[in-house]
Amino acid sequence: MLELFFEYIFPLIIIALKVVAITIPLILCVAYLTYAERRVIGLMQLRRGPNVVGPFGLLQPIADAVKLLFKEPIIPTNADKILFILAPMITFILSLIGWAVIPFAKGVVLADINVGVLYILAISSLSVYGIIIAGWASNSKYAFLGAIRSSAQMISYEVSMGLVIITVLLTTGTLNLSEIIEAQRTIPWWIDLMLLPMGVVFFISVLAETNRLPFDLPEAESELVAGYNVEYSSMGFALFFLGEYANMILVSAMTTTFFLGGYLPPFNISWLDCIPGFFWFVFKVGFLLFCFLWIRATLPRYRYDQLMRLGWKVFLPLTLFWVVLVSSVLVYTDNLPSI
């Protein structure tokens, strides 16, 4: 009986504890990211932001959570009730399970699989389903238009993101995210410089992927009231909200992993290795999240035709050309990694 416990049940308990250890801090990070957003944008707009609930307004996310928890969930009369309820759950769950393959520090990863990049791409592609289901099930023209915009936008920029990731795979020679980070220790500086434009393209693409300004067309308040989640209240709205901000943190972690060295120090200086890798990972993700907030506070929204033109007529040809350029240079200089 004891052997059965240690062979089958104990590993499941360990996995469950790991999942809880990632999920609870992530939800807390999402909650306080909303607080940070309001404070940062407030400072940029010369106002104070939330400062009443608790010292410096630090309890504001808890107050917001309690408010949403006790609000009445209202389902439209003609809505498809089952899909209407499932849609925010799908969005929120998909935003969490993407973290399974992200390395927080050396050896600190829930599932260190050899196809981590494919897993991340698959999960990010699936996230559009929660939004399109919400728009369809709401039986509202505003929600449906927002959902169609979102699906078209996410599919358009997925192509560019995939091609950008191919350039990273060409230089590292692996689909394992931990090995991609370790490969960045030894990559020559000129290859890093060659990948820099692709890092910028990737970051702009994930702005569109997460429906953030200046690409928040699916939620355009002046055109679609609130987009695909216009009919949601209470916990349904809260789950969409949590999913959006969890996706922001996830894509920041992806950008850090692919282009900023993950948990590695930013410079090859011996004393920087004394600082734990987790600190560097959090620092880099935090910097990218600040860029998200900075962009929201300063840039206006794109028109929809401008958004599509940027994706299909600028980013797609550019990333295709860069894949050919990187592969040609790696072959010519004999730096193509063995897979």
From Swiss-Prot:
InterPro entries: NADH_UbQ_OxRdtase_su1/FPO, NADH_UbQ_OxRdtase_su1_CS. It catalyses: a quinone + NADH + 5 H(+)(in) = a quinol + NAD(+) + 4 H(+)(out). The chain crosses the membrane at residues 9-29, 50-70, 82-102, 115-135, 161-181, 187-207, 235-255, 275-295, 311-331. The keyword Electron transport does not apply. The keyword Metal-binding does not apply. Its EC number is 7.1.1.-. Its main location: membrane. It is found in: Cell inner membrane. GO terms for molecular function: NADH dehydrogenase activity; oxidoreductase activity, acting on NAD(P)H, quinone or similar compound as acceptor; quinone binding. Keywords: Cell inner membrane, Cell membrane, Membrane, NAD, Quinone, Translocase, Transmembrane, Transmembrane helix, Ubiquinone. It is a multi-pass membrane protein. One of its GO terms (biological process) is aerobic respiration. NCBIfam families: PRK06076.1-2, PRK06076.1-6. NDH-1 shuttles electrons from NADH, via FMN and iron-sulfur (Fe-S) centers, to quinones in the respiratory chain. The immediate electron acceptor for the enzyme in this species is believed to be ubiquinone. Couples the redox reaction to proton translocation (for every two electrons transferred, four hydrogen ions are translocated across the cytoplasmic membrane), and thus conserves the redox energy in a proton gradient. This subunit may bind ubiquinone. Belongs to the complex I subunit 1 family. This is NADH-quinone oxidoreductase subunit H. It comes from Rickettsia rickettsii (strain Sheila Smith).
